[in-house]
Amino acid sequence: STPIKSSAASDVYKRQPYLLPRFFPQLMKKYPDLDIRVVEMKTNDIKKALQTGEIDAGIVASLAGMEELQQTPLFYEQFFAYVSREDALFNNEVIRTSDLNGEQLWLLDEGHCFRDQLVRFCQMKSARASQLAYHLGSMETFMRMVESGKGVTFIPELAVLQLGDAQKELVRSFAIPCPTRQVVLLTNKNFIRHTLLEVLVKEIKLSVPKEMLSLKATQAVV
């Protein structure tokens, strides 16, 4: 029998569509009695829901201001630029922050840690989401815009791993040190279901490439 059983569902709120398919099917196969609900939320909403006990755990990028919550490291994920063939940056082998400006970028709306980290890394004091980008609203949509010949967006390492050969031709690395985020499992410090957390951490770490489990010398956490 499974070592984890619960009469109530465990809510794991996460914001990474590229991570869930990697570990969730295997988790359910190994622990069929485990009841987990997964919902997408913005980082600040995750923090509030954890503090109120509305949810059990969240998978987020580690950020300042989370000291009152328990952070369990999962892996490190590098950012890449996704550049349209018609953009001047397409001919660059690597992208430097000085090459970027807010007008050519497709960015998520404010409140997404993915956007906030990259704006900080690129030192864009006045970067803002395009109104069109805001209404379209997802990383996948921005990627389709780039593929159709418009602008630049940013994608995480797990997304790059799923791209086809033609799409990978649009991927560019950043100059060293490459911007990278630490992904953590966030819980309330009073959460007592330690076995559940151990299982989640184990399965998530098994689902990503081993080289993502530690920070490389060429990477810098943003």
Locations of the language-model features?
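N-terminal winged-helix
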Residues: A9-Y31, D35-E40, N44-K48, Q117, ...
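Flexible hinge/capping segments at coil-to-helix
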Residues: L69-L105
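Short beta-strand-to-loop elements that line the ligand-binding cleft
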Residues: D35-M41, A61-S62, R128-S138
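Single conserved hydrophobic/aromatic residue that forms the stacking wall/gate
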Residues: T2-A8
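Short loop/turn segments at beta->alpha junctions
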Residues: K42, R96, G137-S138, P156
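Short beta-strand-centered segments that line the small-molecule binding cleft or hinge
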Residues: R22-Q26, R37-V39, T43-V83, E147-K150, ...
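Secondary-structure junction motif
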Residues: Q104-K125, R193-V201, V208-T218
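Beta-alpha-beta core module
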Residues: M66-P73, E77-Q78, N92-E93, E140-N190
